[in-house]
Amino acid sequence: VLFTPPELLGCGNRCSDDCCKWGRCQPGCTD
């Protein structure tokens, strides 16, 4: 089964990995 948990999806170029949680950029983070 090819299932990727949301926390492993990443945010692409929207923000840094440090600011990315559950595939979303967290508030208060710089891009």
Swiss-Prot record:
Expressed by the venom duct. It is found in: Secreted. One of its GO terms (cellular component) is extracellular region. One of its GO terms (molecular function) is toxin activity. Keywords: Disulfide bond, Knottin, Secreted, Toxin. Disulfide bonds join C11-C20, C15-C25, C19-C29. The presence of a 'disulfide through disulfide knot' structurally defines this protein as a knottin. The cysteine framework is VI/VII (C-C-CC-C-C). This is Augerpeptide hhe6.3. The lineage of its organism: Eukaryota, Metazoa, Spiralia, Lophotrochozoa, Mollusca.
